[in-house]
A protein has these predicted regions:
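Structural motif corresponding to the intra-repeat A-B loop/turn of tetratricopeptide repeats
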Residues: 16, 506, 539-540, 546, ...
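Short coil turns that delineate tetratricopeptide repeat
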Residues: 34, 523-524, 564, 598, ...
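Start-of-helix register in tetratricopeptide repeats
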Residues: 224, 494, 527, 568, ...
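Alpha-solenoid helical-repeat scaffolds
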Residues: 365-568, 572-575
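Canonical positions in the second alpha-helix
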Residues: 518-519, 558-559, 592-593, 626-627, ...
């Protein structure tokens, strides 16, 4: 999507409420790219700003200054939006072709005329139903063909439209809520408005979508409006149009809306995973289905096809095992779909090259068997019971149903007769969606999101639009709309914990941190602080290690302020204190943890690590001996005990443990290192050299670190600097 540096500077000024700067940058832009109509709109804005500025400079106190300034700022923003739109149209062959085609139409684009045409269509359809049966089909086809052409033009007009006046917005809102306008037409208009908002924010269109969402009685219309205002929300213009924030704040007082937004956010996450889900199906599920394809699918499920009996004699259990694997593969896919995965994207993405999808509005068209561009195709196959079942009850989005019609018509004649008979009789089994579920808000919204995702991923000219499903390598970006500043300090934050838990389960730590950073202090709960600590610990954001650890510790302590006896938070605090080498504080926390759960081995062991780090070896030995007695084969206990024994000078006992640790399968390199120290202190220099070399070979650690890391301990144990240098010379590669 084309962007212009001059217009970026205008946008930056507007985001800073720098009205004078925005007007100046617009004037500079028009000096480079002449646009007479827009320049004519700029002149009165410049004049009004100059007049306002002159009065202010003379010391006049205008009680209307703030209101006038804000109105002028909004008008300037609208001019910027229209100019940005014009610039994109001129820079895009696709958009300029659409725009030129609309300009050549003799059609009047007034709202009154549009509404009259839409209502006339509904009336005409009703009249056709009163005609003789032998005429109805032809007349309805002619009527639908004209209407499709009209709606296609209206769709293009809306997504390329300028900003709306309040009067225009009000008229469109009434049209979108009117029972005298066909719901399919209303849905198409909302989709076109969404595309327009994605390219350039328009407060009037945003307001219309919010109002339609809150007032529409047709669920499909309502859900498209919801998706539309969420996708089309502004990231920068709230400071210019505070009404946007006011509308959002009002909605966030409604618990039902908050719940619906949480559902939508989760559905967004599943939607953008369509391609990874496809990859999972192809790599993990389809191989089993293809490998075990000695079955057919009927209305009764998976049934066996007769095979050569020799295999049955040699391997009587093989068929049953194959059946189980096939059924398990199907269950995996069904489970993925029930969770919200778009499991059909991979297959249907190959079916979007039909001429039907050259018409842009068809990507958003609710499925209808009377669509004039599918009626001819359906005329020869519409009585196929399998097809009827797919189109009426199949779990497919509208776009995929249209794809299925065209693909099915091409392959039907090439199918084996036995398979065609099965389909004609309606015995080929597919997963069906019951009527009750198909009209639920959740299902309606999911299908629409799949339609949108297919458009933005597969439409030939999708680069002309801001991609609402675009994600980074490790971040969801704008897909994570819960992290939008619009929702900060609103009651939507009451649902951040639920979403955060889901992000945590999916190991989306960067996104979890982004979400947590957006949450205001008033709604921060125990769960918030625990999630925030986990996010910081697992993100790769470059920051000073000490600052990072302090941030984690602060979150754990904030969690404990809200729930002083929370073992998880206390455990996190102790672990971070240990990592920060604040051993005294860590010991105090582990004392509390052991009081809560005295049988938890990790608490006792980590407390002992703190004690030995403080060189309080004797104090650490007693609990370590107990643990070693109870768990003689636990390598972690043996490892800590061995180092503690080394600390108190009981080298032989330590060596016994290190001998055991270094002879187990897949011995840890660290144990060879510590064994080397122990051997050195007992005078077995050659053994120490061999252990150190083994450690260096395994880890690539510089030889000098072996000396430097434990220089203090070695000196206290009587190893001289000269001996240390000689050891370095002996082990250095």
């Amino acid at each position: 999507m084309e962007r212009n540096d001059s217009l970026k500077r205008v946008l930056s000024c507007l985001a800073d409420r720098n009205l004078g700067g925005a007007l100046t940058e617009l004037r500079n832009f028009f000096a480079l790219y002449s646009q007479p109509q827009a320049e004519a709109e700029l002149e009165p804005l410049l004049a009004e700003y100059q007049m306002m500025s002159n009065y202010w400079k003379r010391g006049y106190k205008d009680p209307q200054l703030e209101a006038n300034f804000n109105r002028l700022l909004q008008r300037t923003c609208q001019l910027y939006a229209d100019t940005s739109r014009w610039r994109r149209i001129m820079a895009s062959p696709f958009m300029s072709t659409v725009y030129s085609s609309l300009a050549q139409q003799p059609r009047e684009w007034s709202v009154a005329n549009i509404r009259q045409e839409l209502e006339a269509y509904v009336s005409d359809v009703a009249m056709v139903s009163l005609e003789p049966a032998n005429k109805q089909k032809t007349h309805l086809q002619e009527l639908n063909t004209r209407h499709l052409k009209s709606m296609s033009q209206l769709f293009d007009y809306l997504w390329t439209s300028r900003h709306w006046s309040d009067a225009t917005a009000q008229a469109f809102e009434e049209m979108l809520l009117s029972p005298t306008v066909d719901a399919t037409d209303q849905q198409l208009m909302i989709s076109a408005m969404t595309l327009s908002l994605l390219n350039t924010f328009d407060m009037a269109k945003f307001r219309v979508l919010v109002h339609v969402y809150r007032q529409a009685l047709v669920e499909a219309v309502r859900q498209r409006a919801l998706v539309g205002w969420v996708m089309g929300r502004s990231y920068t213009m709230t400071i210019v149009f505070p009404e946007e924030q006011q509308l959002v704040n009002e909605m966030m007082e409604d618990e039902a809306i908050r719940r619906e937004l949480l559902e939508l956010q989760i559905q967004f996450l599943y939607t953008v995973n369509a391609e990874s889900d496809t990859a999972k199906i192809q790599s993990e599920i389809m191989p089993d289905l293809l490998k075990n394809n000695h079955f057919r699918i009927t209305r009764n499920g998976v049934e066996e096809v007769e095979e050569d009996s020799l295999e049955d004699i040699l391997h009587p259990e093989a068929d049953e095992e194959r059946m189980e694997r096939v059924e398990e593969s199907f269950r995996k896919m069904i489970d993925m779909q029930k969770e919200g995965s778009d499991i059909y994207f991979g297959g249907f993405s190959q079916m979007k090259r039909f001429p039907f999808f050259h018409r842009m509005c068809n990507w958003f068209m609710p499925f209808s068997m009377t669509h004039p561009e599918v009626t001819e195709t359906l005329s020869t196959i519409q009585h196929n019971r399998f097809l009827q079942q797919v189109l009426r009850k199949g779990p497919f989005c509208n776009s995929d149903k249209y794809s299925f019609v065209f693909a099915f018509s091409q392959v039907l004649e090439r199918m084996p007769q036995s398979m065609r008979d099965l389909m004609e009789q309606g015995e080929a089994a597919i997963e069906v969606v019951d009527d009750e579920e198909s009209v639920t808000p959740t299902y309606v919204r999911r299908m629409y999101l799949q339609d949108l995702y297919r458009f933005f991923r597969l439409f030939a000219h999708t680069s002309q639009f801001d991609h609402p499903f675009k994600t980074g390598e490790s971040e969801l970006g704008q897909v994570l709309f819960f992290a939008s500043p619009l929702f900060r300090n609103t009651k939507l934050e009451l649902y951040y914990d639920k979403l955060g838990t889901m992000l945590l389960r999916r190991k989306r730590y960067e996104d979890l941190r982004t979400l947590m950073k957006n949450q205001g202090e008033s709604h921060r709960t125990y769960s918030y602080y625990m999630l925030a600590a986990t996010a910081i610990r697992n993100t790769k954001e470059p920051m000073d290690s000490k600052v990072r650890l302090e941030g984690i510790l602060e979150n754990y302590r904030n969690a404990l302020n809200l729930n002083p006896f929370a073992e998880k938070a206390m455990q996190g605090e102790a672990r971070i204190l240990l990592e920060m080498e604040r051993y005294e504080e860590a010991i105090a926390t582990y004392d509390h943890l052991i009081a809560i759960n005295p049988d938890k081995q990790s608490y006792v062991l980590n407390r002992a690590v703190c004690l030995e780090s403080l060189e309080r070896y004797e104090e650490a030995l007693k609990p370590l001996f107990r643990l070693n007695y109870e768990q003689p084969d636990d390598v972690n206990v043996s490892r800590v005990l061995a180092w503690t024994l080394l600390g108190v000078g009981k080298y032989e006992q330590a060596l016994t443990l290190y001998e055991k640790l270094t002879t187990v399968e897949q011995a840890a390199a660290e144990d060879f290192l510590n064994q080397g120290y122990c051997m050195w202190l007992t005078g077995n220099v050659q053994g120490a050299i061999e252990s150190f070399r083994h450690y260096i070979k395994e880890t690539g650690e510089p030889a000098i670190n072996i000396i430097n890391n434990e220089e203090r301990m070695l000196s206290k144990k009587g190893i001289s600097n000269e001996e240390m240098q000689m050891m370095y010379d002996a082990i250095a590669p």
